[in-house]
């Protein structure tokens, strides 16, 4: 028996994760002082509308170690795989690792592995789907190196249709975005660091 746990950087719908037996651990998003939890109760239409209209920075909070630990404890008798958004983009991976450490102290024989997908969104989803394929006929000891190899040999590319939210959150300067009024393609590679991301961005602009 196994259990796959993922933060909500994964793009699988709530219906799909239920069908596949995956457990989501949600991010929290704050817009104009109102906090939204990325779970089954999130009104996506309302959320996207407010995100588009606000002129203020949008704040996010990653899952806490306790959020992960609750699900781990409920499934401690299973092979556990936890997948997170890139550790370079969020503290979700660190939270999961803290929960893993606490679980190992509480459950001596637990089989648990935290996977830094080194990606987000579609790249994260691809790793989840690959993991689902691996667990069908491989043992925990075989799955772990196989999925890590998959992650380390992957590259994610993505397109930004708008830089509006990057500007609002202080990621890029408005003056820079005005000079480059096109869709921007980014390449997100293994071991990419935030500093390097900005250096590439500055070269583009």
Which residues make up each language-model segment?
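N-terminal glycine-rich anion-binding loop in soluble enzyme alpha/beta folds
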Residues: 3-67
């Amino acid at each position: 028996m196994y259990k796959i746990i993922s933060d909500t950087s994964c793009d699988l719908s709530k219906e799909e994760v239920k069908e596949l037996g995956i457990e989501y651990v949600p991010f929290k998003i704050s817009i104009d002082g109102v906090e939204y939890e990325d779970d089954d109760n999130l009104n996506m239409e309302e959320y996207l509308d407010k995100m588009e209209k606000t002129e203020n920075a949008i704040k996010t909070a990653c899952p806490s170690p306790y959020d992960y630990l609750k699900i781990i404890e409920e499934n401690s008798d299973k092979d556990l795989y936890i997948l997170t958004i890139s550790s370079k983009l969020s503290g979700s991976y660190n939270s999961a690792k803290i929960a893993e450490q606490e679980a190992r102290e509480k459950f001596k024989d637990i089989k648990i592995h935290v996977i830094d997908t080194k990606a987000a969104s579609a790249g994260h989803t691809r790793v989840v789907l690959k993991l689902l394929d691996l667990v069908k006929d491989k043992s925990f000891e075989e799955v772990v190196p196989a999925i890590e190899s998959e992650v380390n040999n992957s590259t994610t590319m993505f397109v930004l249709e708008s830089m509006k939210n990057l500007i609002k959150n202080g990621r890029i300067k408005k003056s820079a975005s005005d000079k480059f009024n096109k869709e921007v393609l980014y390449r997100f590679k293994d071991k990419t660091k935030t500093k390097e991301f900005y250096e590439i961005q500055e070269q583009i602009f």
